[in-house]
Amino acid sequence: MEKKLSKATICVQGGWEPKNGESRVLPIYQSTTFKYDNTEEMADLFDLKKEGYFYTRLQNPTNDAVAKKIAALEGGVGAMLTSSGQAANFYAIFNICEAGDHIVASNEIYGGTYNLFGVTIKKLGIDCTFVNPEASEEEISKAFRPNTKALFGETISNPGCKVLDIEKFARIAHSHGVPIIVDNTFPTPINCRPFEWGADIVTHSTTKYMDGHATQVGGCVVDSGNFDWDAHADRYPGLTTPDESYHGLTYTKAFGKMAYMTKLVAQLMRDLGSIPSPHNAFLLNLGLETLHLRMARHCENAQKIAEFLEQDERVAWVHYSGLKNDEAHTLAEKYLPNGSCGVMAFGLKGTRETAVKFMDSLKLISIVTHVADARSCVLHPASHTHRQLSDEQLREAGVAPDLIRLSVGIEDVNDLLADIKQALNNI
């Protein structure tokens, strides 16, 4: 039923379906365990023979209601909340990869994800090749190997604000028999639904726009249910061969389109944890209820500020896909017709110190490591989020030394413009 509803209605009423006499507002199930009357019923839960709850490290009714809402917003068959966006990306990859495997990823991605793929998962025996997402299909295909398991990209890159050609990435991935995983954090499903363009799996840092108020850290993995794992059974044995920890159960045979999500919860969440608290899920749900309203305001404010910066002689360049002269504008018209998000990147004429002086002069707009919530904030990635990367890696990730990431909130845009103008006057 939910898939027939508008995204606005799903934001408000999706996920939690109260029965007669139950709480109209999503309750917080602040409990580690759930009581059953007999041992057989509990045993069936452990054997995945029936649905239900027995330990919050795997599943919790509050968390599941919120995950169900996000799945409906994205148009997926199922979703799982994680304790951070980084955890979501790790789980999405590790659910189909093991030691000796390989992935391909866009080099236009968040610095933390770049480090996760380029350094951390290598310690688990999983290799990653980064590619320029703007390269030709033939060039990107050269990065694939016989042991490649996935292709990864961000709908709107952080912090470069480039727009991914999702259909192109999907064609490349599917031609090699692997799924495409898209981090859809910045546009959210309000402004883009990657599944409609061929994506197979979507991830989110729900800490950002979905929460919208910087009150909780979280993530989410959503599956479209469209990738045929059995058609590539040799490549994905974790899904298509018996799992000895569940008495020889095979996920694709037992759960069909829910195979990927079931394994994610029953195996990875069981063994690795990283589930958010029910209270954090409750806070996330409060944010989701106004997501459709806030995204419109974010985009409206950001468009006005980007247009101002584009015309100011002290600004060297601006990347915001809503600008007609932006290199990503054509892709934005296709994938983001109703707006992208409130995040933009720009550079000032001068040196790195010029950017620092501008940021230090801001009074209303805060310098924080966060991005994409109700309050406007600014960051210098080369000095902060991407400081672990070398100059060469910064260039590969599309992060110029002068790049300033501005996250436009939902305040009065005239107040924000006034703050930006006075800061520019101080450089």
Model segments located where?
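Conserved PLP-enzyme active-site core in the AAT-like
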Residues: 2, 8-17, 79-311
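N-terminal "arm"/small-domain region of PLP-dependent enzymes with the aminotransferase-like
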Residues: 2-60, 68
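Conserved N-terminal alpha-helix of the aminotransferase class I/II PLP-enzyme fold
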Residues: 38-90, 112-120
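Glycine-centered tight turns that cap/initiate beta-strands
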Residues: 75, 147, 314-317, 364, ...
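PLP-dependent enzyme catalytic core of the Aspartate aminotransferase-like
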Residues: 118-119, 127-128, 146-149, 294, ...
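Well-ordered beta-strand positions enriched in small/hydrophobic/aromatic, beta-favoring residues
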Residues: 151, 219-221, 318, 344, ...
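Short hydrophobic/aromatic beta-strand micro-patches
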Residues: 222, 345-347, 407-409
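Conserved small-domain helix->loop->beta segment predominantly found in fold-type I
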Residues: 272-275, 279-281, 286, 290, ...
